């Protein structure tokens, strides 16, 4: 059981509309270091919401660019030894420059190299850690029961340890699942919506990390920014599923629905 009161946030809550409107006005420069499977998709998702993605991955440039971006995503999904160097350089630079950044510890706990890397990256104080229940449980030091990038645990099961992890690291923890939870250890927000078909399109979950990084660039409260990103994803997923025949049409419709979200009151 959660040790805090859980507040639900769904579209079109006032905070969500305000944050999305501000993002579209500012078009924050978002530094994305992600896995090779989802790079193109993530860029398209960020463009659809109104952000400005930049996939700068050379170790010679990553630190310099991280310092001028509005936000940074580091996703370790297909990490290599060279990628790990880039990620540590970028994370350290963002931390030093006080640039908010998101860690997506894909499949952490399942394999040793990425698990050790994720723990090293925690030294650079991520603003937000986003993952499924198994990944969050593994990062918190327990057996998450994951199978690769997939989770066999419920988001609600991971919430108590997510709250402890938030207090330990100082990061906001975002758990993706049938119901998403966002917590800073003291406050917890739940976001319902979306659709199971979202798990049938490669990169949907990973791109959420980029959306969170984008909202961090315009909303200084990381709990609110992360909840807004999750709520935007949920409503776009719900609307897209209703008009899609399968995963292929869903992918296109999802980009459209993100782009078409209205901020008019």
Swiss-Prot record:
Top-level lineage group: Bacteria
Annotated binding of substrate, by residue: 55, 203
EC number of the protein: 2.7.1.50
Gene Ontology biological-process entries: thiamine biosynthetic process; thiamine diphosphate biosynthetic process
HAMAP family: Thz_kinase (MF_00228)
Role noted for this protein: Catalyzes the phosphorylation of the hydroxyl group of 4-methyl-5-beta-hydroxyethylthiazole (THZ).
Protein name stated in the entry: Hydroxyethylthiazole kinase
Organism expressing this protein natively: Leptospira interrogans serogroup Icterohaemorrhagiae serovar copenhageni (strain Fiocruz L1-130)
